[in-house]
Amino acid sequence: MNDQTRQRLLNLEALVEAGFAPYPYRFPKTHSAEAILKAKRGAPPESEWPEEEVAVAGRLVALRRMGKVTFAHLLDETGRIQLYFQRDLTPKYELLKKLDVGDILGVRGHPFTTKTGEVTVKVLDWTPLVKSLHPLPDKWHGLRDKEVRYRQRYLDLIVNPEVREVFRRRSEIVRYIRRFFEAKGFLEVETPILQPTTGGAEARPFKTYHNALDHEFYLRISLELYLKRLLVGGYEKVFEIGRNFRNEGIDHNHNPEFTMLEAYWAYADYQDMAGLVEELLSGLVLHLFGSHEVPYQGRVLNFKPPFRRISFVEALKEKAGLPFDPLDLERLRLWADAHHPELSQVPNYKLLDKLFGIYVEPELQDPTFVFDFPLAISPLAKRHREKPGLVERWDLYAGGMELAPCYSELNDPLDQRERFLEQARRRKEGDEEAPEPDEDFLLALEYGMPPAAGLGLGIDRLAMLLTDQPSLRDVLLFPLLKPKKEAVEEGV
């Protein structure tokens, strides 16, 4: 225990001896800081409203004792407001010296404005609610060490108001998306997180074991296959906002635990879904920013519809300078071996995706639909109705990263079985990301799934883009981190 913690415990003891409950059960707040400031902002200096009693509570983030008067700043969820304590008005005034910055305090009083016009609460009664046993980070330098910010997000939220705003904005984004799909007649559903097989994407899963069922299960890597079962069951428009888990690497736009929206629309195709997504995102941006322009990492992205549309194959051929059709995987392998030896261990069918990420993806800053992907990298999409070797799939990019894939969904059970068997063959050859065939899903398809469009929208990446953050960790309240190796200090 350090000296500061020891002193704070002594201060707590003194408050208890004076008759205060150490950790009371409740405090009847009547106002937020924001509500008081909004009601009185702009009032002339030295105005006072003694008949308007307010009760506010929050954390002390500044404390300035000046003999017969004490000023403090109290922070609640909505912002901070100044408090004014006066010896001849405030009960137990001398005990204020037992308060520390970081304590949680409840006060009652009435609002007034100071000589400089600052809206302030004149405190007529006060109650310590929680004694903080540790000082807050330095007020001038705040909390800037990213590792500490991620591990102790609670401190980050206390001292960095802009961080609180990021997560409010994230919640607003999710709320808008949910209401949009509900207004379009989509039904929100929940599907299993624990699944007996993996499917819906190619990724390494997390495994777990269910003792009562004596069976190995996986944390889902995708929402897709269970939502498609609902189309078989008769629902025509469904969506889910939920967590997926992939046992893979971590970087600025990948996290093993992430949030996706998936939506499935029966009797529609990928062109229909493109129009819906344009409407969703352009409307969301207009709602948040008042225009279609989004500031992101030194650029301004324009979300005014219609979004740009390009071809996967043509864009890759042009940007990489390929003198042949990229769908010729044997020639593509020879070319990649000569120009990108670091990709020598990448299977041929994944080369297309890897090279697209190198040559095309970084240039896709304004929202862009990339249409018509190769069949080899799209095992769940319907074959293109006009272009052999391609599927009806688009991916939406913005800010140089993928935000959302969409398919005209494959609903031919025989074709789907063949593609699953190809994935199984690759799995036997050592591809750990290739899933095993999901026989129950194939059975569902054999009963008949209507033609449909399917969308997957990455909520974390979208939040990252619309809050101008450089990393997914900045839009995840508690991102996954390597456990600290240091021994846990003995608690107080």
From Swiss-Prot:
InterPro entries: Aa-tRNA-synt_II, aa-tRNA-synth_II, aa-tRNA-synth_II/BPL/LPL, Lys-tRNA-ligase_II, Lys-tRNA-ligase_II_N, Lys-tRNA-synth_II_C, NA-bd_OB-fold, NA-bd_OB_tRNA
Gene Ontology biological-process entries: lysyl-tRNA aminoacylation
UniProt GO MF annotations: ATP binding; lysine-tRNA ligase activity; magnesium ion binding; tRNA binding
Chain residues that bind Mg(2+) 2: 402
Protein's cellular compartments: Cytoplasm
GO CC, any one term: cytosol
Reactions performed catalytically: tRNA(Lys) + L-lysine + ATP = L-lysyl-tRNA(Lys) + AMP + diphosphate
Keywords: Aminoacyl-tRNA synthetase, ATP-binding, Cytoplasm, Ligase, Magnesium, Metal-binding, Nucleotide-binding, Protein biosynthesis
EC number, UniProt record: 6.1.1.6
NCBIfam families: lysS_bact, PRK00484.1
Subunit structure: Homodimer.
This protein's name: Lysine--tRNA ligase
Originating organism: Thermus thermophilus
Gene: lysS
